[in-house]
């Protein structure tokens, strides 16, 4: 018997395959997959950006969706808020994640 996994669950499993990643939380909403990542120490901003880009590349390729629909962040507030969220809260978090991508 096959189980159908949500895109968020698949993304979570992909992100956990990166050795730098300690924890991850995901959700999907309005066609977007939001990924909040906790890592061990990464001191270089370039390395941090490279890891997020690698995560977006791998998730987009696996899920066969546009990278513009993958929102990845190191934001701790976003990570905490994703613990147990309602649909109304997802709208707010999705908006915050989208704003962070444009920075």
Predicted regions and their residues:
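Polar/charged, Gly/Pro-rich intrinsically disordered segments
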Residues: 73-103
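Short edge beta-strands and adjacent turn/loop segments
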Residues: 16-38
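Short, non-transmembrane amphipathic alpha-helical segments
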Residues: 8-18, 44-67
């Amino acid at each position: 018997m096959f189980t159908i996994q949500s895109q968020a669950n698949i993304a979570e499993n992909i992100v956990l395959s990166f050795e730098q990643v300690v924890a991850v939380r995901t959700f999907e909403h309005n066609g977007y997959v939001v990924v909040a990542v906790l890592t061990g120490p990464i001191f270089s901003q370039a390395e941090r950006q490279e890891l997020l880009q690698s995560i977006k590349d791998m998730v987009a390729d696996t899920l066969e969706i546009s990278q513009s629909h993958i929102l990845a962040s190191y934001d701790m507030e976003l990570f905490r808020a994703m613990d147990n969220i309602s649909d109304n809260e997802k709208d707010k978090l999705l908006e915050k994640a989208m704003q962070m991508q444009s920075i």
